């Protein structure tokens, strides 16, 4: 039936929709006044009571409203000052695990491939891209409501299974997904959700078979490919994982939460050009979490070490600069990056970075030892190396290499045997398990 902009509350055909909305609590979260007004008008015309309609232009207001009034119908703007509708969606899911009990719609400025894929991945009810017309928007809202009112047995069973997954009842969820397989001629989602349930239960080989079954039905379906990638990574079948990751990249916009797995597959297979491509993608993201920061930073560091090993110092320098940007100032990566820069002779960058680095980084063992190793490789005089090693020990850092540098340097400087023996004794006291190595310098 065609639906025009005028919605007749009294029409018999519309009674199920009117009844559905009569007691729904609705929350509209949108930064644009024109969008808010259009959405408000639509919901009012569809019969939502004013007392049940909450509207805000602020994410800060939206979160407490979600927690307080617990709306069952939410329309939320995609991005709010680096906050997103998906954060609100997670709250809604925690309150109402069964997706049949709620409607969640995202509004956005554009239907980008990445956003469309995220909507599909999360199985959100709809995406409305601005500018939208009143008639088209109302039509879509009614279509979504009708789909909730008359779900197929297949969709209802999937929702029951997903609700159990959200509640942590994994085995019960798996049984629902197995049941759903027989309720549709093309049960791609049932196979995929069963696969993820089996992954949670650590039934990795069984999960792998589920994802492969979904791919037989739909060879390029994202959930099946992403699940299969996860299985291969867990089983350390890295070449297979890499091949699946290439298929994901070729056929789909990469989801940020899947990027760590793609990076790991590329690193483990030595496909470092891919890691650099993932960095370019990473830099375009509005939101990144710690897992993603850690993955791309570690991946770039491994890539730079590979480049240095093959003698491509220029490429390594570029990669290290990228790692410096990607790590977002995290000390654990800054230390390694700076240490690699020192070994790569990137003196200009080192001075610049150290000037703004926190003391935790500047005075870390990784940086001090990297500086010493660089001076050793550069052929610095034994006297200067001994001086550097002694300064590092005085700073509280303990490392067997420091004592070896002091002992070997002192021998080269032809210091008095008594002094050298005292240094060896001190080294043996600090690291008794390495006494044989230290005393070996005296024998030589």
Regions found by a protein language model. Name each.
Residues 55-73, 80, 205, 212:
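Acidic, metal-coordinating helix/loop segments flanking the phosphotransfer/catalytic sites
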Residues 1-27, 31, 158-162, 282, ...:
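Non-catalytic signal-transmission and effector/linker regions of two-component phosphorelay proteins
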Residues 20-43, 74, 165:
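Conserved acidic segment of CheY-like receiver
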Residues 193, 227, 261, 295-296, ...:
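Canonical tetratricopeptide repeat
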Residues 59, 72-94, 100, 349:
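Conserved phosphotransfer microenvironments
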Residues 173, 207, 241, 275, ...:
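Single-residue signature of alpha-solenoid repeat helices
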Residues 87, 110-126:
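Alpha4 helix (beta4-alpha4-beta5 surface) of REC/receiver domains from two-component response regulators
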